[in-house]
Amino acid sequence: MSRRIRAQKRPVPPDPVYNSRLISMTIRRLMASGKKSLASRILYDALKIIEERTNQDPLEVFETAVRNVTPLVEVKARRVGGATYQVPMEVRSDRGIALALRWIIRFSRQRPGRSMVSKLANELIDAANETGAAIRKREETHRMAEANKAFAHYRY
């Protein structure tokens, strides 16, 4: 075991526009090279596009998208006697949300098109409607866990 003291988790302050911690977490994950103002502009513009297209509260659509993408189980590699098993594990809520945000942003970046604003908006709308690449990733993760259910007794 490491003797190093574990860093304290600092609370994420809510964002100033929607007063949501989830939005703030997304801005921080969207940010590249310390350009937080650019990341926040991209997300807020994407939320405006969502409002125009769906005629719904953009925060509600965003939260639904994140909830739909959040995985419940994942597999972790565990070595037992020279063999590596993919052991299904339940995902803690904070890790699940972090994975969901990471996947939404990653698959937004991979979408074809020019502006990140429209790509992010489209991915969020798709995720809220339970379609899109981020949802496929979650389904794939759940399938992997289901396929390796036999190794569940190796949990640690």
From Swiss-Prot:
One of its GO terms (cellular component) is small ribosomal subunit. Keywords: Ribonucleoprotein, Ribosomal protein, RNA-binding, rRNA-binding, tRNA-binding. The keyword Zinc does not apply. Disulfide bonds: none annotated. One of its GO terms (molecular function) is tRNA binding. It comes from the Bacteria. SUPFAM superfamilies: Ribosomal protein S7. GO terms for biological process: translation. Belongs to the universal ribosomal protein uS7 family. NCBIfam families: rpsG_bact. Part of the 30S ribosomal subunit. Contacts proteins S9 and S11. One of the primary rRNA binding proteins, it binds directly to 16S rRNA where it nucleates assembly of the head domain of the 30S subunit. Is located at the subunit interface close to the decoding center, probably blocks exit of the E-site tRNA. This is Small ribosomal subunit protein uS7. It comes from Acaryochloris marina (strain MBIC 11017).
